[in-house]
């Protein structure tokens, strides 16, 4: 399994159209707010050219890529944290995500209504961000009240948690998101994560653009805003993605080249998701199955083994490792071994992106 990415944003910005194009689903994408009521979930394969190159050598009976769970969450509006629009139920859906893709409308189209009557990319982005902040403030203040009562009764063990809550509240009240990387202490980090804060999730903008001058201005404004709050922007012509979704792979590739687009939206989203979540991919290769596995960057060999089965982690002995480059250069496992490129690694080995692994374990 890869990761779960929630598509969020105001109503009518292109979230469901993007979801449809990427997952090739046919959920409603109507021109009125809240046409998405329940979150729509699509599982898409993560494109990885390395699987194709490995399969040229391995010739496995089955090739299994890792996957991305894409979730189309109903449009949020100003006041959602107070129950406006479809309210808090959708803020709770966001809590389940590993990462958030925030779609912002940068295109002009008189046929598609805007909830505020006019397009302003910075304001639109800020509306959603503020709702996430308000929701987190409510969560933290409720927790703070409970802890205050226990502290007054003499429970000093909660003093550190109380201090962390106050720090987070201070950050949010200044208009900033809570940044997990600001907390290096493992115990502090564990407590912060237990709050399940929306603003602590990795998030990036998807600018839904067109080729007009006004769209370019809206995009530039969004970039300026994103830089101020340390977020990043991916440009996507969602309408174009919708048009090419039904084409076969070669026609899609030809069309993208003709339009001067380097890669489809799915690839951009996955790359950015892997980057902000700190994820890598390793492979297992054999005659029956060639498979990609997603792993948190910096994971040790037993943790990688545990991605396959908990018994592998519990009884881990050694891992046979070949880098992707060596595996390809020397024509597979046998050639890599003959040239001294197969390594035996122990429990302290930190997995690298592209490693081909075979685990030895005993339970």
Language model: regions and residue ranges:
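Amphipathic alpha-helical transducer elements in NTP-driven molecular machines
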Residues: 34, 48-51, 64-70, 84-97, ...
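C-terminal-of-GTPase-core extension/linker across diverse P-loop GTPases
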Residues: 2-8, 13, 19, 148-350, ...
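Short, intrinsically disordered, mixed-charge
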Residues: 24, 56, 92, 130, ...
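Residue-level signal for pocket-adjacent positions within structured domains
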Residues: 22-32, 39-41, 46-49, 53, ...
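Conserved G1/Walker A P-loop phosphate-binding module
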Residues: 1-113, 122, 147
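Short, glycine/charged-enriched secondary-structure capping and boundary segments
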Residues: 83-86, 115-118, 219-221, 248-250
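Long, charged N-terminal accessory/stalk domains
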Residues: 90-194, 234
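Conserved nucleotide-binding/hydrolysis micro-motifs of P-loop NTPases
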Residues: 24-25, 50-51, 75-77, 105-111, ...
């Amino acid at each position: 399994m890869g990761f779960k990415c929630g598509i969020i944003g105001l109503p009518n910005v292109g979230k469901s159209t993007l979801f449809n194009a990427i997952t090739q689903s046919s959920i409603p994408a109507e021109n009125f707010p809240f046409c998405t009521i329940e979150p729509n979930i699509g599982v898409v394969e993560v494109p990885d050219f390395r699987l194709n190159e490995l399969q040229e050598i391995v010739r496995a009976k089955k090739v299994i890529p890792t996957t991305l769970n894409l979730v189309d969450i109903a449009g949020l509006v100003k006041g959602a944290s107070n129950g406006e629009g479809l309210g808090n139920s959708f803020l709770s859906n966001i809590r389940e995500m590993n990462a958030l893709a925030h779609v912002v409308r940068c295109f002009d189209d008189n046929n598609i209504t805007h909830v505020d009557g006019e397009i302003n990319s910075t304001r639109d982005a800020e509306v959603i961000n503020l709702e996430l902040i308000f929701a987190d403030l409510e969560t933290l203040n409720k927790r703070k009240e409970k802890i205050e009562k226990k502290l007054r009764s003499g429970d000093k063990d909660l003093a550190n948690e109380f201090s962390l809550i106050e720090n987070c509240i201070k950050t949010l009240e200044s208009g900033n998101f809570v940044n997990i990387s600001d907390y290096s202490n493992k115990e502090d980090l564990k407590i912060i994560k237990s709050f399940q804060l929306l603003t602590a999730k990795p998030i990036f903008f998807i600018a839904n653009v067109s080729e007009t001058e006004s769209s370019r201005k809206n995009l530039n404004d969004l970039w300026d805003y994103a830089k101020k709050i340390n977020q990043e922007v991916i440009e996507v012509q969602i309408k174009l993605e919708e048009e090419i979704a039904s084409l076969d792979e070669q026609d899609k590739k030809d069309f993208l080249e003709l339009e001067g687009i380097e890669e489809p939206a799915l690839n951009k989203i996955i790359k950015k998701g892997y980057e902000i979540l700190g994820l890598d991919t390793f492979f297992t290769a054999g005659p029956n199955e060639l498979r990609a596995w997603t792993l948190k960057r910096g994971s040790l060999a037993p943790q990688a083994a545990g991605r396959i089965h908990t018994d592998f982690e519990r009884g881990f002995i050694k891992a046979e490792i070949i880098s992707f480059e060596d595996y390809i250069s020397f024509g597979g496992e046998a050639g890599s071994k003959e040239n001294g490129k197969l390594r035996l690694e122990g429990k302290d080995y930190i997995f690298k992106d592209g490693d081909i692994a075979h685990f030895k374990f005993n339970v």
